[in-house]
Amino acid sequence: MNHLDRIGVILAGGKSTRFGRPKAMVQYQERYFYEASLDALQHHTDQVLIISHPTLTNQFRRNEGIRVIEDDPRYQGCGPLAGIFTAIEKESAYWYLTAPCDTPFLKKEIYDILFSYLDQEPDKKAVIPVVNGRKQPLIGLYHRSCLAPIQSLLEQQRYKVGFLFQLVDTLFVEDKAFEQLHSSFVNINRPEDLSEWT
């Protein structure tokens, strides 16, 4: 299999328990939440992969040209780390650009900034934005070499993405431009969260 330089990965394998229905399929301003992630990623790669919850797979597959797969059965229900693992295991690339399915204001410029920092430190294996002192691991860049450490964490049932950063050389990016793009990092967990933006 030939390696692509980059693959976009939309993480949509969660249960949306707090929202009460699948967040990816909620509409804001006449488009689904996940479409903001799709738009942002498609500016940086020709291939976008959706890691889907089993109940949404058929709906996502209506998108022509978008590959849709479910979490590796060994790790279904184990959170975003399982989604990143599945993407790296199933699709061959050097870099995986991740995005959640519940960030309806995500902008492509976030990835421009992350890649600009990676260009300065190309040996890093993960590039993660930090906004107001908080790491944002679901909007990031992950090198294919993260596969083995992620699998090790999953086997140990250590499901927090943050554990990965203790194992791989990670670049944490704090950039003033994130202040103007702060809405990109707003994830919608409850219906009332969305009402604040309407």
Swiss-Prot record:
The N-terminal domain determines nucleotide recognition and specific binding, while the C-terminal domain determines the specific binding to the target protein. GO terms for molecular function: GTP binding; metal ion binding; molybdenum cofactor guanylyltransferase activity. Pfam families: NTP_transf_3 (PF12804). HAMAP family: MobA (MF_00316). Keywords: Cytoplasm, GTP-binding, Magnesium, Metal-binding, Molybdenum cofactor biosynthesis, Nucleotide-binding, Transferase. This is Probable molybdenum cofactor guanylyltransferase. The keyword Thylakoid does not apply. Belongs to the MobA family. InterPro entries: MobA-like_NTP_Trfase, Molybde_CF_guanTrfase, Nucleotide-diphossugar_trans. Its EC number is 2.7.7.77. GO terms for cellular component: cytoplasm. GTP binds at L11, A12, G13, K23, D71, D102. It is an enzyme of class 2 (transferase). It comes from Halalkalibacterium halodurans (strain ATCC BAA-125 / DSM 18197 / FERM 7344 / JCM 9153 / C-125). It is found in: Cytoplasm. One of its GO terms (biological process) is Mo-molybdopterin cofactor biosynthetic process. Mg(2+) binds at D102. It comes from the Bacteria. PANTHER family: MOLYBDENUM COFACTOR GUANYLYLTRANSFERASE. Its cofactor is Mg(2+). Transmembrane segments: none annotated. Transfers a GMP moiety from GTP to Mo-molybdopterin (Mo-MPT) cofactor (Moco or molybdenum cofactor) to form Mo-molybdopterin guanine dinucleotide (Mo-MGD) cofactor.
